[in-house]
A protein has these predicted regions:
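N-terminal signal peptide c-region/cleavage motif recognized by signal peptidases
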Residues: 25-26
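Primarily the internal scaffold of c-type cytochrome electron-transfer domains
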Residues: 33-45, 66-105, 133-141, 149-396
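Short cysteine-rich clusters marking metal-coordination/redox-active sites
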Residues: 57-59, 118, 143, 185, ...
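Anionic, Ser/Thr-rich low-complexity intrinsically disordered regions
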Residues: 60, 65-66
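A cross-kingdom marker for long, charged
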Residues: 382-389, 393-458
Length: 458
């Protein structure tokens, strides 16, 4: 749950500052790395290659060195970083806790640590026939869960002349690519057509899920170094480029989930995991209902779709000046309303929203200069202060976006107290108050430099 993560807001000032300096030195990286916004690779769990196991990577001359090495293109202590600091290494062990045992009982499962329903995201749960001699399911979310089965690329990836394309063809998942990384992370941190943390699973005790690519990568203990060599080899975009690709890829994935679970499911009761949790789950005495820019036309007491993965396409489209940017908010309102009318009407609106997202993707594809990050920061902050992002999941996404934009625009240090107050307003989602979040963002706006495009009076 992001409320836990917000206790330590993701800033990593030294590392991010160095990364931003490198991007300034390589301004063409975003334009060169033309993203497809559509993942092209099979996910590691379904890649068809044998997974040889974490132990096959852990030699001290491979990725198990105790200290970072500077004479090679990789640090070579990746295994140590993962096993000591990365929560993915404990993902399987989470299934052994009392809370997981209780969830398994509630779901009618004998044991969480033996159920595919749980192992699919808490381990590298490939078929038994695809497990190598050193494979151990208890390793949790290990190397090959993200980098793909190493059956064919293990021997290749140490060859100096091997290309990224050759490694990719051998099954190495391109986790450095923001679009591919988003698809991979979303497969567990949101869900896809094959696996989903359903309302039933959350009702059994599983925490609410959320995701934003840049923030989650910054919270991940890095087992890589974003230096000149990395940027040249990976052609990585900067923080804003990552955020753009993550947002648009997530939006498209979310559309597919809505279609799968609300249009094509043929069930009487819709999959409630597609809706905003806090629209229903709050104390009856908490009189928080108030229409906002995104909920016009939705009546009090009506379950609302979780728009957190769509809403920020709108300020992005405004920044890109797409022809349909003014149509995005009305389309999102219609999306919310159509969910209570008929699957047919919902399907039509999903098509409309998809077209608007595709237009934004096309604009992002062909942008030849940097988006004004400060103007985008102001736009998101102003909408937050006005109450557009009142719902917790929306406020959460807005906070993560503002935080990374402050980093990208070298404004984080001067705004640190104000940004920390924004995070503090989100610390406990059960006690969250929309007005407190909006007030905190108003204070943040006061310490930001004036933006020439600012038009809203708060």
């Amino acid at each position: 749950m992001m409320s836990r993560a917000f206790k330590h807001p993701p800033r990593s000032v030294v590392r991010l500052g160095a990364f931003i300096a490198l991007i300034v030195a390589h301004p063409g990286l975003w334009a060169q790395n033309q993203p497809s916004f559509l993942a092209q690779s099979a996910l590691p769990q379904d890649d068809g290659y044998a997974h040889l196991g974490v132990a096959s990577c852990a030699s001290s001359v491979c990725h198990g060195a105790m200290l970072e090495r500077t004479s090679t293109t990789v640090l070579q202590n990746e295994y140590v970083t993962w096993t000591r600091h990365d929560h993915h290494a404990d993902a399987y062990n989470t299934l052994l806790t009392d809370a997981s045992k209780r969830m398994a009982t509630n779901l009618g499962l004998p044991n969480a640590h033996e159920a595919d329903l749980c192992l699919d995201c808490h381990a590298d749960n490939v078929p038994t026939a695809m497990r190598g001699p050193e494979f151990d399911i208890t390793d949790g979310v290990g190397c090959e869960a993200c980098h793909g089965g190493s059956e064919s690329w293990a021997a290749l990836h140490t060859v100096a002349t091997v290309t990224d394309d050759e490694l990719r063809q051998a099954g190495l998942y391109p986790a450095h690519d923001p679009v591919e990384a988003t698809a991979l992370c979303l497969s567990c941190h949101l869900g896809n057509e094959d696996k989903l943390a359903t309302h039933k699973i959350m009702g059994a005790g599983h925490p609410r899920l959320s995701f934003e690519l840049v923030t989650f990568l910054e919270l991940l203990p890095p087992h890589w170094e974003r230096d000149d060599e990395y940027l040249a080899r990976k052609r990585a975009p900067d923080l804003l480029g990552q955020w753009i690709q993550g947002q648009l890829t997530t939006a498209k994935s979310s559309l597919r989930l809505l279609r799968t679970h609300l249009v094509d499911s043929n069930t009487t009761l819709p999959e409630l995991a597609m809706f905003d949790c806090h629209a229903c789950h709050h104390a009856m005495s908490d009189q928080r209902w108030q229409p906002s820019k995104l909920t016009v036309g939705v009546e009090p007491g009506t379950p609302r779709l979780n728009l957190a993965y769509f809403a920020f396409v709108e300020p992005l489209a405004q920044s890109l000046q797409t022809s349909g940017s003014a149509d995005i908010v009305p389309a999102l309102r219609a999306l919310n309303q159509s969910a209570h009318v008929s699957p047919e009407q919902l399907s039509d609106i999903l098509n409309e929203v998809s077209d608007l997202i595709d237009e934004t993707i096309s604009a992002a594809h062909h942008i030849n200069e940097r988006i004004d990050g400060t103007a985008l920061l102001h736009r998101i902050a102003e909408e937050s202060a006005l109450g557009t992002y009142r719902d917790y999941s929306l406020a959460e996404q807005a906070a993560m976006a503002m935080n990374l934009l402050l980093e990208r625009e070298a404004l984080w240090e001067q705004s640190r107290p104000a940004m920390r107050a924004v995070f503090a307003s989100l610390m406990n989602e059960e006690q969250y108050q929309p007005d407190s979040f909006a007030s905190a963002v108003k204070v943040l706006l006061e310490v930001l430099p004036e933006d020439a495009g600012r038009t809203k009076e708060l």
